[in-house]
Swiss-Prot record:
Gene3D superfamilies: Ribonuclease H-like superfamily/Ribonuclease H. This is Crossover junction endodeoxyribonuclease RuvC. It comes from Burkholderia multivorans (strain ATCC 17616 / 249). It catalyses: Endonucleolytic cleavage at a junction such as a reciprocal single-stranded crossover between two homologous DNA duplexes (Holliday junction). Its main location: cytoplasm. GO terms for cellular component: cytoplasm; Holliday junction resolvase complex. Signal peptide: none annotated. Mg(2+) 1 binds at D7, D138. Homodimer which binds Holliday junction (HJ) DNA. The HJ becomes 2-fold symmetrical on binding to RuvC with unstacked arms; it has a different conformation from HJ DNA in complex with RuvA. In the full resolvosome a probable DNA-RuvA(4)-RuvB(12)-RuvC(2) complex forms which resolves the HJ.
Length: 180
């Protein structure tokens, strides 16, 4: 099964594509869609077109996207929601089912701690996918969303579906910390 993860943003939208076979995770692609400094409609169109292109190029079976959190600034929240909507439209227009996860669910599923830092997310994604280098933070979040979805949103604290994947990499959890 191929999963496309999306980390929505108005300026930068991260994407990550993984293949899943049983408990095996395989990296396919990741990167970002950057929008031009232009009016809102142009930026949203760029996100929609970019996500639509990813769906055509990588032919995922499912998609997952991060849910919007309510920011202190309501205008920022509305703009992020619109960017997220453009990405979802690109996914749905490609016929994909779309799952949604909060940042807390994502961090807990990947790192085992809901308030994990960007650096901790990048490190765990790098280890889980056996990458030679760390992806950028937006791409790492998108890959994390795809991994979270691959394991049904299970958390490391319950050792849902990630325990076998960690064991294959020679890793395990000890008192909430990753050890090798």
């Amino acid at each position: 099964m191929r999963i496309l993860g999306i980390d929505p943003g108005l300026r930068v939208t991260g994407f990550g594509v993984i293949d899943v076979s049983g408990h095996q995770l395989a990296y396919v692609a990741s990167g970002v869609i950057r929008t031009p400094t232009a009016d809102l409609a142009t930026r949203l169109g760029t996100i929609f077109a970019g996500v639509s292109t990813l769906v055509r190029e990588h032919a995922p079976d499912q998609a997952a996207i991060e849910k919007v959190f309510v920011n202190v600034n309501p205008q920022s929240t509305l703009l992020l929601g619109q960017a997220r909507g453009a990405a979802i439209c690109g996914l749905v227009s490609g016929g994909l089912p779309v799952a949604e996860y909060t940042a807390l669910q994502l961090k807990q599923a990947i790192v085992g701690y809901g308030r994990a830092t960007k650096a901790q997310m990048q490190e765990m994604v790098t280890r889980l996918l056996s990458l030679s280098g760390q992806p950028g933070s937006d791409a790492a979040d998108a890959l994390g969303i795809a991994i979270c979805h691959a394991h049904g949103g299970n958390t490391l604290s319950t050792l849902g579906g990630l325990a076998p994947a960690l064991a294959q990499k020679g890793l395990r959890l000890r008192r909430g910390r990753l050890v090798g």
